[in-house]
Amino acid sequence: MASDERLVSERFPRSSQYHPEWVLANASGGANSLWLTEWLASALDLRPGMRVLDLGCGRASSSIFLRREFGVQVWATDLWFSAAENIQRIRDAGVEEGVFPLHADARSLPFAPSFFDAVVCIDSFYYYGTDDLYLNYLAQFVKPGAPIGIAEAGLVREIEGELPEHLRAWWTQDLWALHSAAWLKRHWERTGIVEVELAETMPNRWKVWLDWHHAVAPDNATEIKAIEEDGGRFIGYVRVVSRRRGEAKLEECCWPDSLVGGPDSH
């Protein structure tokens, strides 16, 4: 099967309208950001004019997709890809009036409290968000009742004990940041900051992952072999959708800059 054919899928009708060459040229990670954005957006009530933070947007293809498909205003925020690079891509896509690129660290964001109507994180949350204190920090930027959603590479179930043999050649230390939907749901709910509405694994998750890698990195034999041998036992795509609780109390001294001046009792 040609790579172009792999990027056209009945599962993702909106994404399939984008030219495969554009999708591949703007890939910035190990997942098809359009597929994951479409999957996540199907569980969100996105409406024209909403202010959306696309956190860890990479080359901003997810931000362009959100603007084109839903008419939202998007703050395309990333640390590893410059705003100068992303603005050119945004202009080329004809969405400069509604997508605003920003170079920023997810742990030091320059936004006002309650500025956004939604936050989405596409295949990026595991890089910065699994710290026990991070949700308290991130939630301040969305309005009470607004959604925080993630869709990313993850685990079908947590790995207990030793790493399975078939994953060892591919696995690196940073992959321990991958978690299951159930783990993320528990991690968020225990804070009382959000109400988790949805936490699940993508159906045929490993096959979608495999299709993408055959298209974008067919020479990556190590990862392709790991996905094939795993067969959906451990690795796949997950999504979690939550809403900030209106009554939730956020701790101002919790993260990140204010750690230096925390409460005296600590």
Tell me what each language-model feature is.
Residues P20, A153-L175:
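Short, glycine-/aromatic-enriched active-site segment of Class I SAM-dependent methyltransferases
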Residues A31-P48:
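Conserved alpha-helix/loop element of class I SAM-dependent methyltransferases that forms part
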Residues L53, R59-S108:
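Class I SAM-dependent methyltransferase SAM/SAH-binding core
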Residues R107-V119:
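A short acidic, Gly/Pro-enriched loop at the edge of an enzyme's catalytic core
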Residues A118-T130:
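A short SAM/SAH-binding and catalytic strip from SAM-dependent methyltransferases
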Residues D132-P147:
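A short glycine-rich, Lys/Arg-flanked "PGG" loop and its adjoining helix->strand segment in the class I
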Residues W176-G192:
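Short alpha-helix
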Residues E197-H266:
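Conserved Class I S-adenosyl-L-methionine
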